[in-house]
């Protein structure tokens, strides 16, 4: 399979890019737009709290995003209870943003780890109301399986804490998740540089979502391009199939015909 016909499919929707990007922390809207463009991303996540739903006459980041070109993924960043997350998703739908949502229910302000108990409660309600739910969760295979069984369209385990840039801290859990569920697995949070994104894709993840790694870089536009390349390279390497790891050397050249 080549990358030309290798699509990311979420809830029946097809995407050419496996990189999803956020919209926060940029110096200005112009920098954000340029970074999104060179990233090649087709799915853009937006914190509902950052969108002025009550007064759309005021400038908003949505004024700078071509909604014909990109799929909007409203998220519930900043929510610490199921009730708050549910309310936020309903507001996004009522405002005409989307019912395709990234569900976040955080546990505390220091780690920004997900509160899985509240996450499961929120997911159950939102799925019953017809939302397409992509939950940000811990790298716990059991929780990911529960979310899939409930009807979530994908699972989004963290690679490391949000904004930490620590990379994929527990690749073995990610591998178990990949073996345990059939829905797309998208690493969300913790990516710091291009090699982290490539590793996630080489593991077999279906996509990577990031914000700080790009927006917080010294040159966000250049980093966005690097992430574009890394995700594509990692996916192609996964499809190609890496050689087995061995303890001892294996000569590249045949021993037959040696001189002398």
From Swiss-Prot:
It is an enzyme of class 2 (transferase). Pathway: Cofactor biosynthesis; thiamine diphosphate biosynthesis. GO terms for cellular component: cytoplasm. GO terms for biological process: thiamine diphosphate biosynthetic process. 1-deoxy-D-xylulose 5-phosphate binds at residues 163, 189-190, 211-212. It is found in: Cytoplasm. The active site is at 102 (schiff-base intermediate with dxp). It holds the Pfam family ThiG. It catalyses: [ThiS sulfur-carrier protein]-C-terminal-Gly-aminoethanethioate + 2-iminoacetate + 1-deoxy-D-xylulose 5-phosphate = [ThiS sulfur-carrier protein]-C-terminal Gly-Gly + 2-[(2R,5Z)-2-carboxy-4-methylthiazol-5(2H)-ylidene]ethyl phosphate + 2 H2O + H(+). GO terms for molecular function: thiazole synthase activity. Keywords: Cytoplasm, Schiff base, Thiamine biosynthesis, Transferase. Its EC number is 2.8.1.10. Catalyzes the rearrangement of 1-deoxy-D-xylulose 5-phosphate (DXP) to produce the thiazole phosphate moiety of thiamine. Sulfur is provided by the thiocarboxylate moiety of the carrier protein ThiS. In vitro, sulfur can be provided by H(2)S. HAMAP family: ThiG. PANTHER family: THIAZOLE SYNTHASE. Belongs to the ThiG family. Homotetramer. Forms heterodimers with either ThiH or ThiS. This is Thiazole synthase. It comes from Citrifermentans bemidjiense (strain ATCC BAA-1014 / DSM 16622 / JCM 12645 / Bem) (Geobacter bemidjiensis).
């Amino acid at each position: 399979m080549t990358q030309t016909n290798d699509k990311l499919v979420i809830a029946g929707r097809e995407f050419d890019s496996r990189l999803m990007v956020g919209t926060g922390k940029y110096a200005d809207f112009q920098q954000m737009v340029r970074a999104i463009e060179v990233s090649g991303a087709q799915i853009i996540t937006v914190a509902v709290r950052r969108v002025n739903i009550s007064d759309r006459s005021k400038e908003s980041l949505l004024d700078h995003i071509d909604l014909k070109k990109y799929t909007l993924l409203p998220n519930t960043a900043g929510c610490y209870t199921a009730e708050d997350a549910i309310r936020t998703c309903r507001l996004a739908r009522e405002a005409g943003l989307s019912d395709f949502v990234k569900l976040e229910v955080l546990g505390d302000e220091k780690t920004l780890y997900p509160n899985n108990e509240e996450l499961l409660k929120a997911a159950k309600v939102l799925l019953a109301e017809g939302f397409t739910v992509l939950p940000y969760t811990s790298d716990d295979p059991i929780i990911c399986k529960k979310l899939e069984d409930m009807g979530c369209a994908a699972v989004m385990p963290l690679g490391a804490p949000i904004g930490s840039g620590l990379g994929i801290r527990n690749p073995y859990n990610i591998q178990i998740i990949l073996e345990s569920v059939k829905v797309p697995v998208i690493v969300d949070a913790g990516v710091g540089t291009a090699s982290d994104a490539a590793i996630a894709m080489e593991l077999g993840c279906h996509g990577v979502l990031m914000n700080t790694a790009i927006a917080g870089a010294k040159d966000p536009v250049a980093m966005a391009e690097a992430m574009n390349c890394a995700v594509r390279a990692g996916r192609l390497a996964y499809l190609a199939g890496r050689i087995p790891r061995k303890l001892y050397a294996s000569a590249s050249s045949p021993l037959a015909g040696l001189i002398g």
